[in-house]
């Protein structure tokens, strides 16, 4: 560190410049990707609308097992597949974990949203450093929107019977 400061302070010294160049040209070794080892699988729950998903995250190769089926078999819609994989893509761990999930209740859209929340919560337990990225992307927020209940005296939740003045 002192060699580089001397080179900056004393531009007339050519030896200091070569020393500074040698210091900056030191090879930087690439840090290998972290492999996660847990004592037991990470288990979380995700909910959306009427859907409830129990997620188990284990180190692996990126396989999905959703009620005994693959991701493509359970969610044939590409939009739902992208929704489910979004937290893994955000933290760049698509091939780092195997995901086993039990999904019940709701429809495909609600189940996909619940699975996304469950995966995001599990990723935080696996690596707390990923929390800011997942939080910024909005994957840790439970979507509170649900079907509004029907009220008595109305035809639906808000639709009133036709009003006649006379």
Curated annotation (Swiss-Prot):
Residues 142-151 have a biased composition (Basic and acidic residues). One of its GO terms (molecular function) is RNA binding. Gene3D superfamilies: 3.30.230.10. Keywords: Ribonucleoprotein, Ribosomal protein. InterPro entries: Ribosomal_Su5_D2-typ_SF, Ribosomal_uS9, Ribosomal_uS9_bac/plastid, Ribosomal_uS9_CS, Ribsml_uS5_D2-typ_fold_subgr. It holds the Pfam family Ribosomal_S9. Residues 135-166 are annotated as: Disordered. One of its GO terms (biological process) is translation. SUPFAM superfamilies: Ribosomal protein S5 domain 2-like. It comes from the Bacteria. One of its GO terms (cellular component) is cytoplasm. Residues 152-166 have a biased composition (Basic residues). PROSITE patterns: RIBOSOMAL_S9. HAMAP family: Ribosomal_uS9_B. Belongs to the universal ribosomal protein uS9 family. This is Small ribosomal subunit protein uS9. It comes from Mycolicibacterium paratuberculosis (strain ATCC BAA-968 / K-10).
